[in-house]
């Protein structure tokens, strides 16, 4: 899946935008997706610091990973 498909899927599933940013940057307390130096990265941003950064060679892999991470958070909150 690409970034647009991911965004559409999260909107369709009514996932709160408070959980994530698909535009990178350093928003506070969000999972983030970004494209840096030719690779895709997923990280958690808190207080201007990127933590738990994971790099992927493809957009598809990064989008699947962040979707799974967001889904785990949502399911965890429901339980």
Model-identified regions with their sequence ranges:
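A short, polar/proline- and glycine-enriched secondary-structure boundary/capping micro-motif
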Residues: 52-56
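Negatively charged, low-complexity tracts enriched in Asp/Glu with abundant Ser/Thr
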Residues: 1-25
């Amino acid at each position: 899946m690409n970034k647009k498909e991911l965004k559409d899927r999260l909107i369709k599933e009514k996932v709160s935008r408070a959980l994530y940013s698909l535009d990178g940057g350093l928003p506070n307390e969000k999972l983030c997706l970004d494209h840096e130096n030719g690779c895709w990265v997923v990280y958690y941003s808190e207080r201007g610091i990127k933590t738990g950064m994971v790099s992927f060679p493809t957009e598809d892999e990064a989008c699947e990973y962040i979707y799974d991470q967001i889904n785990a958070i949502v399911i965890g909150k429901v339980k």
